[in-house]
Design a protein with these regions (language model features):
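Transmembrane alpha-helix boundary signature
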Residues: 67-70, 88-101, 117-132, 299, ...
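Membrane-interface helix termini and inter-helical loops of multi-pass transporters
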Residues: 92-100, 181-199, 242-250, 274, ...
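Alpha-helical membrane segments and immediately flanking helix-loop junctions
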Residues: 126-166, 309-343
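Juxtamembrane and boundary regions of transmembrane helices in multi-pass small-molecule transporters
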Residues: 119-129, 171-190, 299-305, 348-367
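C-terminal transmembrane helix pair
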Residues: 290-295, 299-367
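Structural signature of multi-pass alpha-helical membrane transport proteins
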Residues: 3-74, 78-94, 115, 198, ...
């Protein structure tokens, strides 16, 4: 993760607009623009608005010469909170459904990971994006986790984030459009965010304790992306093994997402942004191809096993789990337990095997 602590780009002399501002004013400008972007994305009901908004604001700042950087300690703490979020999101309820349907679930996940890895391999092979970036960026889920881990394995986090969050937006919007073919979701309202809920002292203390112990354990064990992975592993064991509940209030998540978004976005330069823009058609084509492939899997599952078409589509959708859950809850005939079990299984397997698959595909690209 040290790659995010880079010094300002050598391009800086030509980008003096923000560099001439005092650091306090740079932070203030970044905060205001982040709030505007995040608010606009929330109003548009786009996924991951609280992370994408600050990241877009930081990209604007970074490409205009901003010299401020998120301190490593704050970035590490933000990663630990995201690790707690991922650990807390894994429900023990998925395991009975997974046990009952494991051949189907495993087949779908393996097929999806294989397809996404092939697309990443092609983008890398054609030198559209550098190194292993495309392999990490093509991962079908766990977007924030993949971005956090990518830097530790030598990929360009900025371009990985660009690919991953573009996929999240495309997948979520496509799922919403497909759902409208089966059910009218126009009357369904997303519940408002309660920014400052009552604090459960025990659950909140457990969250902070897990973040501290998990982050330190990851550092001691020299894990890649130690604060995230250490907290995720430790938190998963405590949450699933001991039944300890964690509380992650929205204000804490918003701060953590902003730290992650700023850390990535502030390291964008105009050269990187131009590179991402040039690669945009191929990246969009790969996302559309992955969505179409998963749609084909859903069609096969629906026809061969008699599963409701919308249930099959939502279950096999490559990412956007939060948005998928909202859409599934809005449809009366959807088997939400099946959808969330398969989505959670894909998320968990991608998280566990993603780094190994990325290294394997990257090695074949170099050969």
């Amino acid at each position: 993760m040290d790659s995010l602590a880079e010094q300002p780009s050598p391009d800086l002399p030509t980008l003096e607009r923000m560099a001439r501002m005092r650091k306090l004013w740079q932070w203030l400008a970044l905060l205001v623009v982040s709030l505007l972007f995040a608010g606009a994305l929330e109003l548009a009901a786009l996924p991951a608005a609280l992370l994408i908004g600050p990241m877009l604001a930081a990209i604007v700042a970074g490409t205009n010469g901003a010299t401020v950087r998120v301190p490593r300690l704050l970035f590490g703490a933000a990663q630990a909170i995201v690790g707690c979020l991922v650990a807390a999101s894994i429900s023990a309820d998925i395991f009975p459904v997974f046990y009952r349907e494991w051949p189907l679930f495993l087949g779908v996940v393996v097929a999806t990971v294989t397809a996404s890895s092939l697309l990443g391999w092609l983008i890398s092979r054609w030198r559209i994006l550098p190194g292993t970036t495309a392999v990490w960026g093509s991962s079908p889920g766990a977007a924030t986790a993949m971005v956090l881990m990518a830097g530790a394995f030598g990929a360009d986090q900025r371009l990985v984030a660009f690919m991953q969050y573009l996929r999240v937006i495309f997948v979520s919007m496509t799922a919403a459009l497909v759902a409208k073919m089966w059910v009218d979701t126009s009357g369904i309202e997303i519940p408002p965010i309660i920014w400052f809920p009552p604090i459960d002292a025990q659950a909140f203390a457990a969250t902070i304790g897990i973040a501290l112990v998990g982050g330190l354990s990851g550092k001691i064990c020299r894990l890649p992306s130690p604060y995230f992975l250490g907290t995720f592993i430790f938190g998963g064991v405590i949450h699933l093994g001991l039944g300890v509940e964690m509380q992650l209030p929205p204000w804490l998540l918003a701060i953590s997402y902003a730290m992650v978004g700023w850390s990535i976005g502030l390291n964008f330069t105009r050269a990187i942004l131009r590179h991402a823009t040039r690669a945009l058609p191929q990246i969009i084509a790969s996302i559309v191809a992955l969505i179409a492939f998963c749609g084909g899997l859903a069609f096969m599952i629906s026809h061969l096993l008699g599963i409701d078409p919308l249930t099959a589509y939502l279950a096999t959708s490559p990412g956007g789990m939060d948005s998928i859950a909202i859409i599934a809850a809005a449809a009366q005939n959807v088997d939400i337990s099946f959808v969330m079990a398969l989505q959670s299984a894909r998320f968990l397997i991608v998280l566990l095997v993603g780094p190994s698959v990325a290294r394997l595909v990257a090695r074949s690209v170099r050969q």
